[in-house]
Design a protein with these regions (language model features):
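Conserved C-terminal alpha-helix-loop-beta "cap" of PLP-dependent enzymes
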Residues: 55, 101-184, 193-197, 230, ...
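Flexible inter-domain linker/hinge segments
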Residues: 175-249, 253-261
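Short acidic (Asp/Glu) and glycine-rich catalytic loops that position anionic groups and cofactors
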Residues: 11-14, 66-73, 88-98, 128-129, ...
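Conserved PLP-enzyme active-site core in the AAT-like
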Residues: 1-59, 121, 125, 134, ...
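Conserved phosphate/anionic-ligand binding catalytic regions in large, soluble enzymes, centered on
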Residues: 21-34, 38-39, 83-87, 241-262
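Short beta-alpha connecting loops at secondary-structure transitions
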Residues: 11-22, 45-50, 70-78, 98-105, ...
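Generic, well-ordered alpha-helical scaffold segments in large soluble proteins
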Residues: 3-7, 15, 34, 38, ...
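Structural motif of enzymes handling amino- and sulfur-group chemistry
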Residues: 56-127
């Protein structure tokens, strides 16, 4: 889909769960928040930039620090930051491993699965809440009937109201699962499901499709094997410091000394 900034949005927020994080029975998952350059100083948290050290080597440094409450006082924004660092790291490495091509394939697979089900349901005279969709469909149907049939097949749809059923698809949705979904809605109308014909072309309107590049940084285009990715993760780990290496200097809310005797 087209980037929010190309639509004129100043701020965009959302969930990053779809980027490699399992559902986990509801959570946790990382989220994202992005803004135009003009508003970056109003962003919560810390923004890290690339600079050079005194020897001329590239170095990461804090380009913008907005969290410290002793500095910002009543204007501090740390209260809207969360400690989902592990989830954010998983999301980042998922993007590193898959790169722009992999993310496009995943998005297309999810969309075509939704489009295949949408076409099959419309052929059975079901009405979609919207003709324009990416990976999620909302269908007008008798929710109680569909729910009973779906549970028999081990499928849990979302039922926003008595007359609506909602479902989402992803890159691991199989043809067998698609056929099962279609058969459930066929049974709800007392019909027998016909053979499902896969949709192979995007249904997203041209005006909504993204044309601009993304994930162009070298790190998102360098690691395509499991071994290469693991070596990269290990390289980053060796740059970190922990209590296994030395005491962590007191300097901020995230750098304190936890003596081994206290970690029981």
């Amino acid at each position: 889909l087209k980037a929010p900034g190309e639509w004129g949005a100043d701020i965009a927020v959302g969930s990053a769960q779809r980027l490699g994080t399992p559902m986990g029975f509801g959570g946790p998952a990382a989220g994202y928040m992005t803004t135009r350059e003009a508003f970056k100083r109003n962003m919560p948290g810390r923004i890290i930039g690339v600079s050079v050290d005194r020897l001329g080597n590239k170095a990461l440094r804090m380009a913008l620090q907005m969290r410290e409450q002793h500095i910002k006082r009543e204007r501090a924004t740390s209260n809207i930051c969360t400690a989902s660092a592990l989830m954010a790291s998983m999301t980042g490495f998922y993007c590193v491993y898959n790169g722009p091509e992999g993310l496009r394939r995943a998005a297309e697979t999810a969309h075509l699965a939704a489009a295949t089900v949408a076409r099959a349901l419309e052929a059975m005279d079901y009405r979609l809440a919207s003709k324009e969709f990416f990976d999620t469909l909302e269908v007008e149907a008798e929710a109680a009937v569909v729910q009973s049939l779906a549970l028999e097949q081990g499928i849990n749809f979302y039922y926003p109201s008595e007359g609506r059923v909602r479902m989402s698809f992803d890159e691991v949705t199989t043809a067998a699962e698609i056929e099962t979904v279609v058969s459930i809605f066929a049974a709800a109308k007392g019909k027998k499901a016909k053979a499902v014909k896969a949709v192979t072309e995007s249904c997203v309107p041209t005006a909504l499709r993204r044309q601009s590049p993304y994930l162009q940084e070298p790190v998102f285009n360098a690691y395509r094997s499991e071994s290469a990715l693991m070596r990269y993760i290990k390289k980053l780990e060796l740059r970190d410091i922990s209590l296994a290496n030395s005491m962590i200097s007191l300097g901020s809310c995230t750098m304190k000394l936890n003596a081994a005797a206290l970690m029981q």
